[in-house]
C-alpha cells in the first residue's frame, strides 16, 4: 500500500474545491477563503484536524484516490444506470490488511491514519499536537516538542532574513 502525503497546497485545494468545507473553515476562523493560503502551517493543521467535516472530506478524497489506483471504481455509465434503478452506488474499499469491503459511495469508510502523512509527519502525531494545543495541555515536554518543530520549520526563513540584513 502506498503512503499518501498531502502538502499544504493540496489540503488547501481540497478545502477550496469543496464549498461546504470552505464555508465552514472560513466562518469558524473569520477568514476569507483566500486567507487560508496565508495561514501558518501549525494553524492550518489545527483548523483541519479540529474540524470533523474537513477531516471526513479529506478522508473521502484519499479513499477515492486509493480506489482509482486499484482500478475498482465504477465507471460513470454504470453509475447512471444504478441511480435509475434506485440501487445504492457502491465501491470496493481495501484496507491495509487487504480485506475488501463493498461500501456505499456516499459513506466515508475509515481510512487507516497510519498510512497518511501531512508534510512528512504522521497524521496521528499532528493530531496529538493540535489536541494538546486545543486542550491547553502545556506540559514542559509538549512545549519543547512544539517549539522544536516550529523552529525546524522556520529555520530556512530565519537564515534568509539574516542574509538580507547583512
From Swiss-Prot:
Pfam families: Phage_Gp17
InterPro entries in UniProt: Phage_Gp17
Domain of life: Viruses
Induction and repression of expression: Expressed in the early phase of the viral replicative cycle. The C2 promoter controls protein p17 transcription and is strongly inhibited by the viral histone-like protein p6, probably because of the formation of a p6-DNA nucleoprotein complex at the right end of the viral genome. Thus, protein p17 is synthesized very early after infection, and its synthesis declines later on due to the inhibition of the C2 promoter by protein p6.
GO biological process: DNA replication; viral DNA genome replication
Stretches of the chain forming a coiled coil according to its record: none
Transmembrane segments: none
Keyword Membrane: no
Keywords assigned: DNA replication, Early protein, Viral DNA replication
Similarity-based family: Belongs to the phi29likevirus protein p56 family.
Known function: Involved in the replication of viral DNA. It is required at the very beginning of the virus amplification, conditions in which a low number of viral DNA molecules enter the host cell, possibly to recruit the limiting amount of initiation factors at the replication origins. Once the infection process is established and the other replication proteins reach optimal concentration, it becomes dispensable. Optimizes the binding of protein p6 at the viral DNA ends, thus favoring the initiation of replication.
Subunit structure: Homodimer. Interacts with the histone-like protein p6; this interaction optimizes the binding of protein p6 at the viral DNA ends, thus favoring the initiation of replication.
Protein name according to UniProt: DNA replication protein 17
